[in-house]
Structures are given as C-alpha cells and as structure tokens.
C-alpha cells in the first residue's frame, strides 16, 4: 500500500488535483505522480503529475 493513498504500490488509483501518491499510478489522470520538474524536462511533462518542488524531481534524473 502507498502510505499516501488507498492503493497497492504499482497499481492504479484515483488521485485528486493535488496528487500525493508516490508508488502507484493515478487512474483519474493516467499519469504517475512525481515532483514538479524543471522547465525543459520533456520526460516529466509527459508522464507525471506535480506533487512537489522542481529541485526534488526524481523522474528526470
């Protein structure tokens, strides 16, 4: 289970506008949740929902 949402890690779940899920995919927005990424990070823009500061982005590292 993801401690921040009611889903099993890696499974789909429904997320609100402010996505707190870290280990699951959000069915409602069809994207994985991650920190907000710096400008120019195409990978993050395509598959993530912002949930944190850009300097803590992990999906574009």
From Swiss-Prot:
InterPro entries: Metalthion_dom_sf, Metalthion_dom_sf_vert, Metalthion_vert, Metalthion_vert_metal_BS. A divalent metal cation 2 binds at residues 7, 13, 15, 26. A divalent metal cation 1 binds at residues 5, 7, 21, 24. One of its GO terms (molecular function) is metal ion binding. Residues 1-29 are annotated as: Beta. It comes from the Eukaryota. A divalent metal cation 7 binds at residues 50, 57, 59-60. One of its GO terms (cellular component) is nucleus. A divalent metal cation 5 binds at residues 34, 36-37, 50. Class I metallothioneins contain 2 metal-binding domains: four divalent ions are chelated within cluster A of the alpha domain and are coordinated via cysteinyl thiolate bridges to 11 cysteine ligands. Cluster B, the corresponding region within the beta domain, can ligate three divalent ions to 9 cysteines. Belongs to the metallothionein superfamily. Type 1 family. Metallothioneins have a high content of cysteine residues that bind various heavy metals; these proteins are transcriptionally regulated by both heavy metals and glucocorticoids. This is Metallothionein-1B.
């Amino acid at each position: 289970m993801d401690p921040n949402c009611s889903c099993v890690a890696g499974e789909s779940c429904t997320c609100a506008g402010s996505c707190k899920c870290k280990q699951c995919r959000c069915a409602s927005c069809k994207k994985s949740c991650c920190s907000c990424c710096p400008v120019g990070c195409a990978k993050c823009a395509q598959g993530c929902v912002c949930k944190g500061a850009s300097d803590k982005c992990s999906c574009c590292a």
